[in-house]
Regions:
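A conserved beta-strand-loop-helix scaffold within acyl/acetyltransferase catalytic domains
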Residues: 1-30, 34-46, 91-229
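Active-site/acyl-donor-binding loops of N-acyltransferases
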Residues: 21, 39, 100-125, 249-250, ...
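Aromatic (often tryptophan-rich) hydrophobic motifs at membrane interfaces
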Residues: 21-29, 34, 40, 44, ...
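A gly/proline- and charged-residue-enriched helix-loop-helix capping module
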Residues: 50-95
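Short intrinsically disordered coil segments
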Residues: 52, 128-137, 294-300
Length: 324
């Protein structure tokens, strides 16, 4: 998903990032391998290459360890020549870490990564979920009189975004710009789906999923806290999983979660109790002060915690391009 033209175009159109690809293939020949990046220029977080910003993960597309090792070492040289502050990879495959470390890259941010196996029968998938926190909440939602609407219309996007702003406000964070979601819909088309649960006509919860080949991606979720007891979010997720399973999906990617985000981590653990570790790799090594999560970002988060909700939405449009 995160290698697709639609995703890269959305990053470019929303934040002005320049998509780049590095390959060992000669000019004017068919691409045999490659690593996708975005070139980011920011007065706040510096000039850098990230593979890829606002993407939970992005695997290098190489056919051999020799190809990958060559590209890693080339990027080290290019970083010095171009005066990039750092280069960042976000791979899933653990083999990458071994090669990267041998080439001088260092581990950076670490996350939990939840993936639900959908190759089992749907009934067996449901039985694998936490009985109290997922199964019973889904069953409760089915009796609660919720109405589900699916699609990517402007009306659905507006309702989703209202809930998204509310949710981000609860966590004292600015919302991702509205234009990001508009551009995602334009770039990804039918691969993107919004699902919203309504209670008596009021949006109660919403999710946004992406589909690429046999993988369904849970990218965004939002809710109105007044309706949490209804179990609307688990219900929406299960509906999305059921529909994806029927159309051939074999995996449900729930994305990354920071260790400190205990609420979200607990929620996802009820679906996938044994998450994997997701490690980002940087060259050169980033100090806490030097990284995008350093003191400038921490100070910004403190400021956001005191902002009115409308002002936070404006600040999101201003700051997100610096923190990809």
């Amino acid at each position: 998903m995160f290698h697709t033209v639609g995703w890269l175009q959305t990053l470019q159109h929303t934040y002005g990032y320049e998509p780049l690809a590095f390959t060992t293939s000669p000019p004017d020949t068919e691409l045999a391998n490659g690593i996708a990046f975005c070139y980011i220029t920011s007065w706040l977080t510096g000039r850098r290459l990230v593979s890829l910003p606002f993407s939970d993960h992005c695997e290098p597309l190489c056919n051999s360890t020799e190809e990958l090792d060559f590209l890693l070492r080339y990027l080290q040289t290019a970083r010095k020549q171009q005066n990039w502050r750092y280069v960042e990879f976000r791979p899933i495959n653990g083999i990458f870490g071994q090669l990267a470390e041998a080439a001088g890259f260092r581990p950076g941010a670490r996350y939990f990564f939840h993936r639900l196996d959908l190759r089992l029968d749907l009934a067996d998938v449901f039985a694998s979920l936490d009985k109290d926190s997922v199964q019973r909440r889904i069953q409760h939602a089915e009796r609660a009189g919720l109405i589900e609407k699916c699609g990517r219309s402007e009306d659905l996007l507006r309702d989703f975004y209202r809930l998204f702003v509310i949710t981000r406000g609860r966590h004292q964070l600015p919302p991702t710009p509205y234009a990001w979601f508009q551009n995602l819909i334009q770039g990804l088309g039918e691969a993107l789906e919004i699902r919203i649960a309504y209670k008596d006509g009021t949006p109660a919860a919403a999710i946004l999923t992406l589909r690429f080949k046999d993988v369904l991606y849970y990218k965004y979720g939002s809710s109105d806290a007044r309706f949490h007891k209804l179990g609307a979010t688990p219900w929406l997720l299960w509906n999305a999983i059921s529909a994806a399973k029927l159309s051939g999906a074999n995996e449900f990617d729930m994305g990354r979660t920071e260790e400190g985000n205990t609420g979200l981590l607990t929620f996802k653990n009820h679906w996938v109790p044994t998450p994997k570790e997701l490690v980002y790799w940087n060259y050169p090594e980033l100090s806490a002060v030097g990284s995008a999560e350093g003191w400038k970002m921490k100070m910004a988060k403190r400021v956001f915690s005191f902002m009115p909700r409308k002002l936070m939405a404006l600040s999101g449009r201003l700051v997100y391009r610096h923190i990809g």
